[in-house]
Amino acid sequence: NEQYRALYKSVPFYIVFNSRFQYGIFFDNHFHTYFDLGKSYKDELKVEADGGNFNLFFIGGDTLKDIVTSYTSITGRTHLPQLFTLGHQQSRWSYMNEKEVLELAHNFRKYNIKCDVIHLDIDYMERYKVFTTSKESFPNFKEMVDSLHSSGFKVVTIIDPGTKVEKGYDTYEYLVNNKLCATLNGETYINEVWPGESIYPTFNKKETRDFWADEIKKLTDLGVDAIWDDMNEPASFKGPLPLDVDFAGTSHKEIHNLYGNFMAEATYDGLKKHTAKRPFVITRAAFSGTQKYSTIWTGDNQSLWHHLRANLPQLASLGLSGFAFAGSDLGGFGGDATPELLSRWVEAAIVYPLFRNHSAMGTIRQEPWVFDKKTTDIYRKFVDVRYELIPYIYDLFYKQTIDGIAPIRPLVLEYQEDENTYKLNDEVMLGSNILHAPVLDQGVDKRLVYLPKGKWYNYFTNEELEGGYHIVDAPIDTLPLYVKEGSILPIGTYETHVELLDELVLKVYKGSSTYIHYQDDGESFDYEQGKYNLYEISHVDDDIKVKLLHEGYKRYKKITAYYEGKKIDIKL
């Protein structure tokens, strides 16, 4: 739009639909592109690019889901994530030293607020040099990480592409001496980012990616579990990179939109090589297809109500565009959150695939306990709801690897025949079974909710509602969250953080349906060798049956269902 003419990511894909037809357009061109969708001329759609080939995919299908499935078969799908990545994550620019990080972890357990991940922003580094740790602020980095691991936390560290110009700094020396950095007029190109004068790796070159992947070992050897790629548009402090900066024979003009994608690929390869686990990478810059390597977030948002309102349509649109694993900074990154805004944001965020609280230096702290007891209690309540939903979300990610349909969805994707869903952007579906209608406005204790045809049940009270429009009460500690009739939901029973469960707990709702539940070790690639279980769960009201469709992993020791308040023990 006119206010935000360029964002962190380039995804040249859109869908056109009405009550009669639907199609998708993917413009496979990574140069600077322009889309004029009827603005200049009402009946004209215009697509242009500053260079490259005109590779245009016209994607048809009987439904919107068909289009998304076809599009993701072209660009790739998000790999099955590690289970812990679906948990609550805490970040700030920055937690400045070991004492602050360990106190943060202690407070999550003290206040009984579930949390799986702590993120370390740029100040953990030695003078912002990538692949280093500060000897002054983090003198015992590995011991700190070990302590966090023993308390059930994983650790994510940020890295940037900008590599400090410093004689004797091995990462810099290798990149320069092996000509693996950008040049201008035949000389190493230097701009400024956090470390000061910096060079830019040529991630479009395989040799550079391989080197970067091996550098990741410096962090994984310290126990780091995952990597957050930032500033990889690439960002610069002394003006944008000139378009003729040379990246291994390719101009910045051509590579700009792909730079973050190549960095994410290198980071993914490094984590896979040096941990043998499913890589958890988060990237700020991305292009169509980056979902194969990385989770994304929407970037540096603000603690503003209209930014909260923007999150649901943003994440639903990213899901339609192949980015199944996406999130926005819970509470807002810039500016000061208030108790009300933080409370409403955590309620909204329980369905974000990436569930991370993040804020900027110089802003009011927004950890769950910093305001007052009421806010802390609300925050805890909805983090608990998120953890109940994790097995269901994990199932959605498994299904996404097959059909490309993201966990978070606009209502129209599930109810395309219902024209009332066409312009709804303040409600979303989590999978096919849960409708999420958070309060997104300040000072509001009621909201209008639209429920598609059929019966729906309040997730918290089990109140039954018919499809249609409803004005519902939603005081500050209440979230309008509804489950479709007949649904079967696997429920997480975690204590402080995500762990493998011995018991499968199901919530079963009046009606009938069949549900497929996926189980594996939650971290390795063993599932690619068939080491997983698939359970088919079917029911007509309280007559519940479970059978194994595929067995390659240890079974649950116990399966328990809850139907209308009644506990039912189930045998395979």
What does each model-identified segment do?
Residues T478-I570:
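Accessory, solvent-exposed terminal regions and/or long lumenal/extracellular loops of proteins
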